[in-house]
C-alpha cells in the first residue's frame, strides 16, 4: 500500500490550495490532490482488499521516516504520510479483531539514488544553506555503516532493503507482528515523538 509524490517545491505559504493557485504556480497538484494521492489511495486500497483477505491475510503500508522528522519543503508529502501512520494503527485494531488480518507500516529512510541527492540539494536551496548540508545531516543520524560501490561508508538503504522488509512483513515469518512501525533506515536515530507533541502534552 504505497503512494508517492514529487520532490520539494514549496514552503507552507506557497503551497497551492485551489486550482487557481495551482495554475498560477504552474504546478500540477494542490494540497488536496496530494492528500488524496498519499492517503486516499492507500485508504481505499485497504478497504477494497480487506473484503477479500482471509484470516491470516496481511496489509503493508509504506510510509516514510520523514513523517517523524523534518523534511523541508515537503508538507504536502509528510502530512498525508503521517495520516497513513495513524490509519495503519486503526486498521490493525479493526481488521485484526474482526478478520484476523495483520496490518503493519514500513518506514523507509532516504533511499540511495540520484533522486534523493536531487531532493536534498533542492532542500539546501530552499533553506539557503551550504550544498550537501541536508544529505550530511541525515547520514549523521545513521548508526549502521555499509560501504557502497562508491566507497562511501554511510550510504543510505537501497530499494532492495525496502523490498526485503515488505516481503518479511507480508510473510508467515512475521505472523505475530501487527500494528507495528518497522524502520528500514540503517538505524537512523529519529525519535518516535516530535518535539511539538512533547511540548503540547500536559
Task: Show the residue positions of the predicted features.
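Amphipathic alpha-helical dimer-interface segment in Rossmann-like NAD(P)H-dependent oxidoreductases
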Residues: 4, 29, 33-57, 92-97, ...
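Active-site loop-to-helix junction immediately N-terminal to the catalytic Tyr of the SDR YXXXK motif
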Residues: 70-79, 90
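Conserved mid-core segment of classical short-chain dehydrogenase/reductases
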Residues: 4-30, 34, 73-76, 117, ...
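Short, small/polar-rich loop/turn modules that mediate ligand/substrate recognition or access, typified
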Residues: 97-102, 177-179
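Active-site helix of classical SDR
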Residues: 46, 80, 88
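Catalytic Tyr-X3-Lys loop
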Residues: 16-43, 60, 84, 153
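A glycine/serine/threonine-rich, flexible loop-to-helix segment
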Residues: 13-19, 98, 111-150, 193-202
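Short C-terminal tail/terminal secondary-structure segment
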Residues: 9, 154, 165-168, 178-202
